[in-house]
Amino acid sequence: MARIAGINIPDQKHTVIALTAIFGIGRTRARAICASTSIAEDAKIKELSEAQIDILREEVAKYTVEGDLRREISMNIKRLMDLGCYRGLRHRRSLPLRGQRTKTNARTRKGPRKPIRK
């Protein structure tokens, strides 16, 4: 198994699919990485030479991925909450942010129903 950005990449999969195992790299970015490194998208990871894997590592290192990306996302949410803006308040109350209805539905975001006290 090749190790890129601290993640073990599956050997049996095509390069594009294998790169999506890294948090922050989807199909589009994986295709762009393959194009810029001139590595075939349909080549399997086990077929790549060590030099090609090093090139992939360098290319992936240019992007914000894995722990850094998770930290950046959580810091953005924390910043919204500290500002006290509408989106921050919705995050704080664990409610939908983007205008969805909450009288019915929104159970995923709100969590399980709380019993009504009498």
Swiss-Prot record:
Q: Which UniProt keywords apply?
A: Ribonucleoprotein, Ribosomal protein, RNA-binding, rRNA-binding, tRNA-binding
Q: Molecular function (GO) terms listed?
A: rRNA binding; structural constituent of ribosome; tRNA binding
**Function, in words:** Located at the top of the head of the 30S subunit, it contacts several helices of the 16S rRNA. In the 70S ribosome it contacts the 23S rRNA (bridge B1a) and protein L5 of the 50S subunit (bridge B1b), connecting the 2 subunits; these bridges are implicated in subunit movement. Contacts the tRNAs in the A and P-sites.
Write down the HAMAP family for this protein, in alphabetical order: Ribosomal_uS13
In residue numbers, the region (Disordered) covers 94-118
* One Pfam family here: Ribosomal_S13
Subunit relationships: Part of the 30S ribosomal subunit. Forms a loose heterodimer with protein S19. Forms two bridges to the 50S subunit in the 70S ribosome.
Name the gene for this chain: rpsM
Q: What is this protein called?
A: Small ribosomal subunit protein uS13
Can you list the GO cellular component terms from the UniProt entry? cytosol; small ribosomal subunit
Single GO biological process annotation from the record? translation
User: Into which family does the record put it?
Assistant: Belongs to the universal ribosomal protein uS13 family.
InterPro entries noted in UniProt: Rbsml_uS13_C, Ribosomal_uS13, Ribosomal_uS13-like_H2TH, Ribosomal_uS13_bac-type, Ribosomal_uS13_CS
- Protein's organism: Shewanella frigidimarina (strain NCIMB 400)
